[in-house]
């Protein structure tokens, strides 16, 4: 095999690949045997017709095309490795010569990973945000603890209050006509959660268990279902059940009940320490992000459209998987939100480009600085990850390799080391 490479435009090269005549001839012979097993050739049992008869029966072009299909992928990857390029899209292939007994020659136009022109990335000055815990934040954390340990009371009687969980049946209509998604039975709604359209929840306050209530609302002008935007609606609502949370007072007894501490002051001190640790971690992460952002801003790189589109595809795949957990798909999501796949792709484009630039710049810095991840470091990180997922490092390693994600995982560790390097150099 021989490979000639020509740069035809930015981020695009053309490979002219010459495959040995013996390799192509062997591929033709193999293709002939495969075709002999598939087609019925008069006078011969399946698989017994000689190559000349197969070629005469199916045609030279069909035979040679099968041979090329069989070896093109392998020969292309050999050429890519020999040329030392990193394709980011499928090649555009043209066959130049395809004759038995002669070399197979093809050209492949390939979009490759772009070169990064690094700017300043050492000694970057970024102010670190001071980690602070306010009394208000501590109070909010105490309230969260109070919420977590609240008792839920199933009321036999009483009226709906704010923060109650009310179980309701409802049927909505616009101009007397029911609409899709406007009817449900046994629905649990937290009053004040804002999960229904404005005005709905407030009109249930004061209703009694078993009571039927007419709720009049107007759909917002920007409502996700276009047909309902700005429309007046009537909901017939029946209150089935009522739940209310009972909160323990914030005192020493509360501290004893939910923690190892004897007093509320001790609990507060512990919570403040934990909040401070979290605040320091956030400040550190913000500083890291700011340093990386500056290094990326100082660099220049022209990202091929194919790379951006591929990344958008990945982002949409992730989104589709997350939606599937809610019993939805992208098409349904687009319908509910009044958008389209094209609009979503364009909205994701800036983030996809920004993420790619960050990855490429970090990769370029790692290459210049010789930052790598050793097998020992890789195995140590795999062990930590395996412990988190309650599996063995070997099982995790096999799973990553089976999905073809090991290279991506290793690169993420290299990127992490590179970020730490930038912080150390700042």
From Swiss-Prot:
Gene3D superfamilies, alphabetized: 3.10.50.40, Trigger factor ribosome-binding domain, Trigger factor, C-terminal domain
Presence of keyword Cell cycle: yes
Any one GO molecular-function label of the UniProt entry: protein folding chaperone
PROSITE patterns according to UniProt: FKBP_PPIASE
Gene Ontology cellular-component annotations: cytoplasm
GO terms (BP aspect): 'de novo' cotranslational protein folding; cell division; chaperone-mediated protein folding; protein transport; protein unfolding
Free-text comment on this protein's domains from its UniProt entry: Consists of 3 domains; the N-terminus binds the ribosome, the middle domain has PPIase activity, while the C-terminus has intrinsic chaperone activity on its own.
Family: Belongs to the FKBP-type PPIase family. Tig subfamily.
Protein known as: Trigger factor 1
Species in which this protein is naturally found: Desulfitobacterium hafniense (strain Y51)
């Amino acid at each position: 095999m021989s490979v000639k490479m020509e740069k035809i435009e930015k981020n695009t090269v053309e490979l002219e690949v010459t495959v040995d005549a013996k390799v192509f001839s062997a591929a033709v012979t193999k293709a002939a045997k495969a075709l002999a097993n598939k087609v019925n050739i008069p006078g011969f049992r399946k698989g017994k017709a000689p190559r000349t008869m197969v070629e005469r029966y199916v045609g030279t072009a069909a035979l040679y095309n099968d041979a090329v299909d069989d070896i093109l992928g392998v020969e292309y990857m050999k050429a890519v490795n020999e040329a030392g390029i990193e394709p980011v899209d499928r090649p555009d292939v043209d066959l130049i010569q395809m004759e038995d007994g002669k070399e197979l020659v093809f050209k492949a136009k390939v979009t490759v990973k772009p070169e990064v022109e690094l700017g300043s990335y050492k000694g970057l000055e970024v102010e670190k945000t001071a980690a602070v815990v306010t009394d208000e934040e501590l109070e909010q954390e105490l309230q969260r603890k109070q919420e977590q340990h609240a008792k839920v009371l199933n009321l036999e009687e009483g009226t709906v209050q704010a923060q109650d969980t009310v179980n309701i049946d409802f049927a909505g209509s616009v101009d007397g006509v029911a609409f899709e998604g406007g009817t449900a039975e046994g629905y649990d709604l937290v009053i004040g959660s804002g999960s229904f359209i404005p005005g709905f929840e407030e009109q249930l306050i004061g209703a009694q268990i078993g009571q039927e209530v007419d709720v009049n609302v107007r759909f917002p002008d920007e409502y996700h279902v276009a047909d309902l935007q700005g429309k007046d609606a009537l909901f017939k609502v029946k209150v089935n059940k009522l739940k209310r949370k009972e909160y323990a007072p914030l005192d020493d007894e509360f501290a004893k009940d939910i923690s190892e501490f004897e007093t509320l002051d001790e609990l507060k001190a512990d919570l403040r320490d934990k909040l401070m640790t979290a605040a320091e971690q956030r400040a550190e992460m913000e500083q890291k992000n700011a340093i990386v952002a500056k290094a990326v801003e100082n660099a220049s790189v022209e990202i091929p459209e194919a790379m951006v589109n591929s990344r958008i595809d990945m982002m949409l795949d992730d989104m589709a998987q997350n939606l599937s957990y809610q019993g939805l798909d992208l098409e349904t999501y687009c319908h509910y939100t009044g958008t389209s796949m094209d609009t979503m792709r364009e909205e994701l484009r800036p983030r996809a480009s920004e993420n790619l630039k960050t990855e490429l710049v970090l990769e370029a810095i790692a290459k210049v600085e010789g930052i790598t991840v050793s097998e020992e470091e890789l195995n140590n990180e795999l062990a930590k990850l395996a412990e988190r997922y309650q599996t063995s490092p070997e099982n995790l390693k096999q799973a990553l390799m089976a999905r073809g994600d090991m290279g991506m995982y290793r690169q993420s560790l290299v990127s992490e080391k590179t970020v730490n390097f930038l912080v150390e150099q700042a």
